[in-house]
């Protein structure tokens, strides 16, 4: 039953996305371009509660899907903190076992994203584009906070 639901959900998501107004937030594409152009030590991954197929449908709609080399998705585990562990394992498969947790940066817009990073000893950049303001996100222990990704350069992120 669950797989049938997600199959139907993903189908309708693909049908309806072109009919709704949505945009890639300012700064996202610039940062993705900067990180992609960076040396091989920077690898982009996606950690989301969406299923892999739903994430693919959403990101393809905005021409972002091909930017990420690895990921952890809602169909990998229902607990966001476990997704962080899965993403870390997958990153080590791509980069190598020498990857340290503190070299991982999770960018998100909720206290749960900050907690997710903390659960594996990673850094976090909290972006106040969702339902939480910068002060709330900073108080959760984010390594850094910005109002929007357009407010920070790739080099600054790499120094976090």
Whereabouts are the PLM-identified features?
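Short, well-structured alpha-helical segments
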Residues: 2-6
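Membrane-embedded alpha-helical bundles of multi-pass transporters/translocases
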Residues: 9-10
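Short, acidic loop-to-helix structural element flanking the phosphoryl-transfer center
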Residues: 14-46, 52, 56, 68
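Helix N-cap/beta->alpha junction signal
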Residues: 25-28, 48-51, 110, 130, ...
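Substrate-recognition "cap/lid" segment bordering the active-site pocket of phosphatases
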Residues: 45, 50-106, 111-120
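Short, acidic/turn-prone active-site loops that include or flank metal/cofactor-
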Residues: 72-79, 128-132, 149-152
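Acidic, Mg2+-coordinating phosphoryl-transfer loop and its flanking beta/alpha structural elements
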Residues: 106-146
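Short amphipathic alpha-helix with an adjacent loop that forms part of the alpha/beta core around
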Residues: 152-160
């Amino acid at each position: 039953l669950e797989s049938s639901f997600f199959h139907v959900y993903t189908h309708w998501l693909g049908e309806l996305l072109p009919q709704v107004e949505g945009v890639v937030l300012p700064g996202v594409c610039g940062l993705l371009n900067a990180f992609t152009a960076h040396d091989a030590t920077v690898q982009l991954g996606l950690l989301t509660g969406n299923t892999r197929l739903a994430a693919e449908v959403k990101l393809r709609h905005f021409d972002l899907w091909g930017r990420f080399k690895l990921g952890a998705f809602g169909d990998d585990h229902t607990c966001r903190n476990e997704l962080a562990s899965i993403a870390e394992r997958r990153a080590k498969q791509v980069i190598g076992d020498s990857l340290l947790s503190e070299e991982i940066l999770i960018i998100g817009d909720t206290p749960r994203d900050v907690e997710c990073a903390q659960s594996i000893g990673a850094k976090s950049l909290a972006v106040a584009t969702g339902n939480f303001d910068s002060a709330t996100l900073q108080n959760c222990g984010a390594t850094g906070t910005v109002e929007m990704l357009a407010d920070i350069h790739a080099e600054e992120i790499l120094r976090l």
